[in-house]
UniProtKB/Swiss-Prot annotation:
Organism annotation: Bradyrhizobium diazoefficiens (strain JCM 10833 / BCRC 13528 / IAM 13628 / NBRC 14792 / USDA 110)
A GO term from the CC aspect: cytosol
InterPro entries in alphabetical order: 6-PGluconate_DH-like_C_sf, 6PGD_dom2, G3P_DH_NAD-dep, G3P_DH_NAD-dep_C, G3P_DH_NAD-dep_N, NAD(P)-bd_dom_sf
Main EC class the enzyme belongs to: oxidoreductase
Protein name: Glycerol-3-phosphate dehydrogenase [NAD(P)+]
Binding site for sn-glycerol 3-phosphate: K107, G135, S137, K190, D243, S253, R254, N255
Phylogenetic lineage: Bacteria, Pseudomonadati, Pseudomonadota, Alphaproteobacteria, Hyphomicrobiales
Active site: K190 (proton acceptor)
Catalytic activity: sn-glycerol 3-phosphate + NAD(+) = dihydroxyacetone phosphate + NADH + H(+); sn-glycerol 3-phosphate + NADP(+) = dihydroxyacetone phosphate + NADPH + H(+)
Length: 326
């Protein structure tokens, strides 16, 4: 089994900072890369990131804006938003001269290409060994060392297991998998479904409706996963059902918070990127290409595109023909 002694986290937002703390707790030599030199200097000197207030960065984490320095690490965690993943890996590609694990830590599908995160990595960097980290996790919880469990998947089981050994600790428990596509579908779909759950809360439709929406949403996620060859245990595991339950239950989820705002007729929360808003139309197109029925996801995409009002979407879902549960 390969041992990874050094880890670089690309992206010094809240999630990137939390992952740097994870790697440091696991005993790795950690570099946190920030695109903005001033931002990097501030974090390095104060050991505080304004994007993750109240969390003090471990003293041995190196913070830099020099990409070449970060790229020397044994493994790379890409903590940029999904739609910026290709740009980040493109920048890294010329610095990666040997097989190096490149782990996507964002949940989504690339616009335009309809590529999943590991596919983007494989295209953008010749020597990258693509992997995906996903599951029920909030940056604040992870950074503070609260117990968290996630899934880390790569095509080769030995690589996935080695990555888990490199990042795991008593408070951060990754489970390894080779079902890369199943993990990616769970993370992408749950973001869209969390927006729908937030709309239910914003519209004050009640706890029963929220439970029904979450359950039927999982049915959509599972149908798409099966159509794409995902394993049932992945879809019902941490990166599928687990992440869906978390994202549909608290406004800490940016997608859930966006849904609440939409349901109340308010503006979207300022400065909060909700990946589900970008993923919704791509997810619906992916489902259509595989002849998978995803009415909740379709409703979210239509609402976000101003093609359907929330009231019309709710009525449409509630008046669908009765059928057997699946």
């Amino acid at each position: 089994m390969t041992a990874f002694h050094s880890v670089a986290v690309i992206g010094a937002g809240a999630w990137g900072t939390a992952l740097a703390m994870v790697a440091a707790r696991a005993g790795r030599s950690v570099t946190l890369w920030a695109r903005n030199a001033e931002h990097a200097t501030r974090i390095a000197s104060t050991r505080d990131n304004p994007r993750l207030p109240g969390v003090r960065l471990a003293p041995d984490i190196v913070v830099t804006s020099e990409l070449a320095l970060a790229a020397r690490a044994d493994m790379l965690l890409i903590a940029t938003p999904a739609q910026h993943l290709r740009g980040a890996v493109n920048m890294l590609a010329s610095h990666i001269a040997r097989p190096t694990p490149v782990v996507a830590c964002a949940k989504g599908i690339e616009h335009g290409t309809h590529k999943f995160m590991t596919e983007v990595i494989a295209e953008a960097a010749l020597h990258a060994q693509p992997a995906i980290l996903s599951g029920p996790s909030f940056a604040d919880d992870v950074a503070r060392g609260l117990p968290t469990a996630v899934t880390l998947a790569a095509k080769e089981e030995e690589l996935a297991s080695s990555l888990v050994q490199a990042l795991g600790s008593p408070t951060f428990r990754p489970y390894h998998s080779t079902d890369v596509r199943g993990v990616e579908i769970g993370g992408a779909a749950k973001n869209v479904l969390a927006i729908a759950a937030g709309i239910v809360v914003g519209r004050n439709l009640g706890a029963s409706a929220l439970a029904a929406l979450t359950t039927r949403g999982f049915s959509e996620l599972a149908r798409l996963g099966r159509a794409c060859g995902a394993r049932p245990e992945t879809l019902s595991g941490l990166s599928g059902l687990g992440d869906l339950l978390l994202s549909c239950s608290t406004a800490q989820s940016r997608n859930f918070a966006l849904g609440i705002a939409l349901g109340r007729g308010e503006a979207a929360p300022a400065g909060k990127l909700a990946e589900g808003a970008f993923t919704a139309p791509v997810l619906v197109e992916l489902a259509a290409a595989r002849n998978v029925d995803m009415p909740v996801s379709q409703a979210v995409a239509a609402i976000l595109d101003n093609k359907l009002t929330i009231d019309a979407a709710i009525e449409g879902l509630l008046t669908r023909p009765f059928k057997a549960e699946e």
